[in-house]
Amino acid sequence: IISVSPALFRPEEGKHYSVGIHPWETGATPDFELLERAAAHPSVAAIGETGVDRLRGAGIDTQTDVFRRHIALSESLRKPLILHVVKALDIILAVKKECRPAMPWIWHGFRGNATMAKQLADNGILLSLGSHFNTDAAASIPADKLLVETDESTAGINETAARIAACRHISLPEVIALASENLQRAVAYTV
């Protein structure tokens, strides 16, 4: 899934996308109409990146309001939500508890520890690991909550998956199968 902002969304045949107003882009007035149009496109499999970043972007209240709009869109279109979160776990979990979404949430680029991974998994959030991750967390994430990503890394997906496999003491094909099944289940509502 390729993550793009609504303004840059130019779908190509055979590719799947997520569209969202990234927390870093919440300082300008967000164009929710453009987001809604792009999100409704059949090649869009997920909504986001969205969430709250305490280190960058507009104020927390603005980011949280934009996040809630993304949640509503995710629910109305029945597409999973991709999260970008920095030092805002408390806000994300409070909003999730309040909104009680039916659609899956995917924590993009998860770098937290095993305790945080358990807390998120217990709240039904899938955890996507990129090239930088906590090895104890990678070993402890429940099998049905594990995803693998490349993001902007030069490391290929297989290289990242192999490192995760080593942490979990399983084979590379097993990690790829787990992550593939989990992604298929997460986007099953849309494709």
Where are these regions (language model features)?
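Mid-domain alpha/beta scaffold segments of enzyme catalytic cores
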Residues: 1-191
